[in-house]
Amino acid sequence: MRVVILGSGVVGVASAWYLNQAGHEVTVIDREPGAALETSAANAGQISPGYAAPWAAPGVPLKAIKWMFQRHAPLAVRLDGTQFQLKWMWQMLRNCDTSHYMENKGRMVRLAEYSRDCLKALRAETNIQYEGRQGGTLQLFRTEQQYENATRDIVVLEDAGVPYQLLESSRLAEVEPALAEVAHKLTGGLQLPNDETGDCQLFTQNLARMAEQAGVKFRFNTPVDQLLCDGEQIYGVKCGDEVIKADAYVMAFGSYSTAMLKGIVDIPVYPLKGYSLTIPIAQEDGAPVSTILDETYKIAITRFDNRIRVGGMAEIVGFNTELLQPRRETLEMVVRDLYPRGGHVEQATFWTGLRPMTPDGTPVVGRTRFKNLWLNTGHGTLGWTMACGSGQLLSDLLSGRTPAIPYEDLSVARYSRGFTPSRPGHLHGAHS
């Protein structure tokens, strides 16, 4: 089957890889001159299935009000003048109760754990290089309340069979030795030993090269004007004066998916702006070993070979990509506070990207009402964590194979009234 994939970020390229491996003739289209040059370029670098959780959580509405008056707040909102933003925020607020949080986190962890397994298999099969580390993730708590709240997430981890360690502050240095110097600032941590780290851009570009060698065609520097449809199916992609035709089409444009699908399929994907610093390592024994998550500031500190990536924060501000100095100061403050000897912060590269977020935090993966239009978007801050699993799942569905995990509650249909997913663990055949 001829398949066109729109988007060459980590999700689009992973989709191309798995569809090619399933025997399809794949073409990837992107406006950029190469793969992973937008949202996948400099994300936090963590592959943390156990920490997969929606921003829509109990207590967030009240916290959001408090954060409005804090200099280093992890969340900021600025109205962009669109009804879509208001509707999206309202849907997000409706997901902030405990029952929705547990449901959403459960399916996010399910997909993320599966994705980590897919990445492990891909690594074993291809020996793909991306400065990966398999040293786990350590979530740090600065208050006793945060430490106590961890028990809520532990319930989900236990249900999913995810191993963990809940550590008091005196034991944090067993996992991250450099934290011995700052343990007095912390109340404890939650460590997930099976989590990983890696450079998402390096992974995506290397996978794109391997996919191209396997027969995938990449059409870079090719802006997409619109999808052409006749009411029942898509019959082409208009790129300037050219119409590119295929048997199936996959939307993986990230935050830009919503606008491209306007008038065809309504999807609640909105850009969530984030920032990162990439810092050269100064002292090896003062740098992180793997990934740290600062629960207070919602910031991740990730170790690559000779660099530290510091990333996080969420701004609901539309498609604004301005680099704001106060955000840089927050990232610098957190990394200096936890790893004062770790990196040459003054030499850091500052970056921002737009993560495609759904109100419930879960991506939309699967077929639409059009029989040949498929979605793989809306992964929010977890595109790197979920990319391989989402790509494999999409490939299975499009190819008519039964996926390895429950999938019905991952489709855009969950936003339809009256939608009832199958019981967990029960799998139907593909729709196609």
UniProtKB/Swiss-Prot annotation:
Its EC number is 1.4.99.-. FAD binds at residues 3-17. The gene is dadA. Its cofactor is FAD. It catalyses: a D-alpha-amino acid + A + H2O = a 2-oxocarboxylate + AH2 + NH4(+). Gene3D superfamilies: D-Amino Acid Oxidase, subunit A, domain 2, FAD/NAD(P)-binding domain. Oxidative deamination of D-amino acids. Keywords: FAD, Flavoprotein, Oxidoreductase. One of its GO terms (biological process) is D-alanine catabolic process. SUPFAM superfamilies: FAD-linked reductases, C-terminal domain, FAD/NAD(P)-binding domain. Belongs to the DadA oxidoreductase family. GO terms for cellular component: cytoplasm; plasma membrane. InterPro entries: DadA (IPR023080), FAD-dep_OxRdtase (IPR006076), FAD/NAD-bd_sf (IPR036188). Pathway: Amino-acid degradation; D-alanine degradation; NH(3) and pyruvate from D-alanine: step 1/1. It comes from the Bacteria. It is an enzyme of class 1 (oxidoreductase). GO terms for molecular function: D-amino-acid dehydrogenase activity. This is D-amino acid dehydrogenase.
